[in-house]
Amino acid sequence: MTFDLRRTIEQPVLSLGAPKSRCSVETIPDRGDKEKIVEESAVQISYALDTFYFLVMGALVMFMAPGFAMLEAGLVRAKNTSEILTKNVALFAIACIMYLFIGYDLMYSGASGWLPGLDLDFGLGEDNAVADVIASDGDTYYAGFSDFFFQVVFVATAMSIISGAVAERIKLWAFLAFAVVMTGVIYPIQGSWSWGGGALSDLGFSDFAGSGIVHMCGAAAALAGVLLLGPRAGKYGANGAVHPIPGANMPLATLGMFILWFGWFGFNGGSELKLSNIEEANAVARVFVNTNMAAAGGLVAALLVAKLSFGKADLTMALNGALAGLVSITADPLSPAPGLSVLIGAIGGVLVVFSIVAFDRIKIDDPVGAISVHGVCGIWGLFAVLLSNGDATFMGQLLGTLAIFVWTFVLSLIVWSIIKAVIGIRISEEEELLGSDAADIGIEAYPEFTRG
């Protein structure tokens, strides 16, 4: 048998893929049908690519969880290491559960005002159907489940900020009780005001990846807890002297900082939400570069300021300087030029050094500098948006900053106070002297060093 390879589109085509006894004849679709198939295939490929990108970025943000754990474990004393590691792994699990059943619905209820909708599904429904995605003509460009995954690791990040600030004197179960409310209610409601399409989204407030929504929110909750807890024993003298309490493991703290720096590419890069065209791909690349440059600027600035202020370089200030730069650029890592990103990060690095010193002077004890890094620099980051983003307004940034801070601080203070009244939030003086590992956990991270 011979075949004429010069068939017209209208001619039948012999399908050779079937068994010999069941050869079938198919008709090649006309040009209009072929174009429709190509368009639908392009939509599906873009959807798959953007979903995969979103999931990978979320996985990078999840990797920030061990970053926080290592940083905090390095900056606390050896006798409190296992306890702070337990807090970090437990808070991540609690955040995932609470955000699944309550928080995600509160944050993305579709309400346009200050109060979110209360129509809770207590879980995730079905994901996007193929027909619906194709019919959207590209407006639905990633899986709903990928959005949940990306958002839930942000919630855990906000809670991780609190862990370091209240370290070395808080009761484990009091902290975990607060984590339930913070991740299920406090964080999602303020997040609904902007990312969820609520009141702040119409007031000119801009926060690309969460300098305020994530970082300042976590710092405000931490500040409320620190004020109720009080300082660690021996931190401040009667005459106002500040007694340094060095961390046990600087290599671990340094590793934690680098893990956070690495994970931040997902934190900021994923917030572009899309990758599957040239413009979006260029935007993600720009976000990566600006994020990196801000961290570098923050670290160098903090290192220089510490040298000028204290006479010696300070590793912990350098580590916090890098994180300060990252927090500072998070509100808008897309609009600035790379050089401006260095400057924004550098200002954050300067601020964090003076902020840590200032908090010590007023006896607000923050063992890892979390309130300074995420709170002070989070506020700076929100206003730094005005340097390069013409769509943001000063009043919008001011209103957003005040709304997020006041809501989080006041609600957190109430919740911390209730927990304090019910089960207490601070370990005893004897337990603090012995260490949280022995008092709360029963397993010491460095038994050969913490005991004789």
Identify the meaning behind each predicted range.
Residues D4-Q11, S15-I37:
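Short, Lys/Arg-enriched N-terminal segments with co-localized hydrophobic residues
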Residues C23, K34-G452:
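Hydrophobic alpha-helical transmembrane bundles of multi-pass membrane proteins
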